Amino acid sequence: MPILLFLIDTSASMNQRSHLGTTYLDTAKGAVETFMKLRARDPASRGDRYMLVTFEEPPYAIKAGWKENHATFMNELKNLQAEGLTTLGQSLRTAFDLLNLNRLVTGIDNYGQGRNPFFLEPAIIITITDGSKLTTTSGVQDELHLPLNSPLPGSELTKEPFRWDQRLFALVLRLPGTMSVESEQLTGVPLDDSAITPMCEVTGGRSYSVCSPRMLNQCLESLVQKVQSGVVINFEKAGPDPPPAEEGQPDISRPFGSQPWHSCHKLIYVRPNPKTGVPIGHWPVPESFWPDQNSPTLPPRTSHPVVKFSCTDCEPMVIDKLPFDKYELEPSPLTQFILERKSPQTCWQVYVSNSAKYNELGHPFGYLKASTALTCVNLFVMPYNYPVLLPLLDDLFKVHKAKPTLKWRQSFESYLKTMPPYYLGPLKKAVRMMGAPNLIADSMEYGLSYSVISYLKKLSQQAKIESDRVIGSVGKKVVQETGIKVRSRSHGLSMAHRKGFQVLQGISEDVPHRLLDLNMKEYTGFQVALLNKDLKPQTFRNAYDIPRRNLLDHLTRMRSNLLKSTRKFLKGQDEDQVHSVPIAQMGNYQEYLKQVPSPLRELDPDQPRRLHTFGNPFKLDKKGMMIDEADEFVAGPQNKHKRPGEPSMQGIPKRRRCASPLLRGRRQSPAVNSHIGGKGPPAPMTQAQPGLIKPLPLHKEATNDSIVDDVVENHVADQLSSDMTPNAMDTEFLTSPPNLLEPSTNHTEALGHEHLGNNDLTVGGFLENHEEPRNKEQSAEENIPASSLNKGKKLMHCRSHEEVNTELKAQIMKEIRKPGRKYERIFTLLKHVQGSLQTRLIFLQNVIKEASRFKKRMLIEQLENFLDEIHRRANQINHINSN
């Protein structure tokens, strides 16, 4: 799981702009996002962990650490601001300490018991800076210095602040402020000459001098390829140079002196196991000291082990069933030199100085060997002093048949004395795998001394406490200073002791003599208060604080506040200013919703709710949806149990009058047509039809005025004319006879009754049912006075076809959603559809459409057959009438 730590320069110099118009900090943010996109192409990037550190003071510099997720990382990256100093050394130390936080707890470093390349936590630090001078509170620095004192326990066990699996890369932005006239050449990205370059090379990384956006993308692609699992090792040549590749031919081309391949500081790749995804190894790299059982502490180690190789050609040694570790070397001058020799059958042995008890160079623990195809160079890690051990083990199993003799045991014990004690554990596992489990006695001590073990345990506990403290401090904001500290002048005389001030004092008699005795030490704890930027000046308190061009505007505001006597507070902003919100705050609906009153309860909370089943394609659950409007967020929970097809009587606003222009000043024609058809004005109903499905009023105990208000549809009121006012409409309604209102107010029965008549819907009845309102109208006109007949028609038309059909549609939709194949009630309700033939056909088509949503095939088939029969009968009637 690679760790990718971005160290972003947030000094004030990052506010400079390139020729693209963007600041260096914006360029750095874009570079991080581009790197993440390029890295996401690799399937191995799923295990990446991203961290973010800035140039602020610790612990505020850590923006995203071990516990923060990807969303937090991106949010902190977006909110970075360039303000502060270029404290590169302190920030690098903070980054390294953050990476080393858990190493003592997990035991990755394995202090005193050899270095295990397969115990690693690969990390890459990518620093993005502008390469300016290093500035601190004490001044400007020319060289990069990392603080030596670290709060992390156990840091004294390693000489350097970094580890061998941590590499530092730097992107130094050198983008010019003006467009370059010269064309950019496609060459390699050069190293930068800033102070961070030597630090990068020490850790095994490098720096990039970025001079153009194209070069920046090239660097990011190179960095993505650098994300490899491995450790950095110093390879140094020990002894003379190797002889020429072909004997008898002198190597004329070889120059004298030190060569680049003599000392290389490169990475060895530690590949993870394809099955487990974790690297697997057997043998450590020896320590550079011989463990002393009497030593109370451990000597500090270098971050990168120094491995020396001998250029003497040797035969590679391998025996059956003895495990070994194989690591590929990163391309370097050393690998190039070995491959050019073209001798894959020979190898060079490797050593660690002072690893043996009496030998300064130590014994070999492996060898360097070119691959058979001469494509790479591999480091083979074997048991310590393997040229002695391997022949002994070979004789044990091939000659002695796993039954060691006394002479063999003496040779084996003498070998164990030359081997560091921490190799006993891996060696016991290896011989057990080979078939000799009792070869090494369990009583042999191969661990650390008691004092060292206690010391390491104590450091581990302290590191755990420090880790919890650092993790808990991540995300805390910098404490803002409440004022500016008053500091005494370090040089020069004070104002009161200057000669010019004394001359002025002699001229003027008003100057108090106390000024001569001023002592700045009395004001060491004083602070100058800062202005509150969020506090707006109350300019209406003083007319002279108002700019001249804003006098009329302020006068208008003050007049509006004065005239609004119902308000208990002064309103400092007008309506336009309330809606003048910065773009960055436009999407922040949470603060606005906190001030909105809670939504009203459901109209009928006792009504049973239909439970959603798993996999229901019609489920409208909006809990997980992102809402971009505050009003929708508030209004959403009220209607969450309604489908789009269901009418919501709760949201119908009240209307005062019927606004159909077709009803004004003219007698209704006998022909009956619906609003939907648009062919003519519909006839109002004055009496309820027998068996009519009556819509329920919203308020059962409301007055006549409120009943008419509730039942008027929204689209009716949109056609109001100026000659009909609400007061006039109310007067007309109140003066109308009571018997005119009874048919529309006595709607107390719901649509769920079963005594609605015959369930069979005939085509003839469907075609002729729309003529009934005219007969009802004629019978009603005989009993109603002529003075109020036109008024009643206007009112009852608003309560006629639209409301009845809406209620019928709601009931039919509920019946369609019910499981089963009992459709008699649907056809019964279809008998009572009001309006013209065209209105009824549209209504029937909507029912078929709703049935198709719920896959009611039998119902659809019956309704379509019924619809075809209607068209056929209608065509016959039209044909007869035309004849």
Curated annotation (Swiss-Prot):
It is found in: Nucleus; Chromosome. One of its GO terms (biological process) is protein localization to chromatin. CDD domains: vWFA. InterPro entries: INT_SG_DDX_CT_C, Integrator_subunit6, VWF_A, vWFA_dom_sf. Gene3D superfamilies: von Willebrand factor, type A domain. GO terms for cellular component: actin cytoskeleton; chromatin; INTAC complex; integrator complex; nucleoplasm; nucleus. The keyword Ribonucleoprotein does not apply. GO terms for molecular function: protein-macromolecule adaptor activity. Belongs to the Integrator subunit 6 family. This is Integrator complex subunit 6. It comes from Mus musculus.
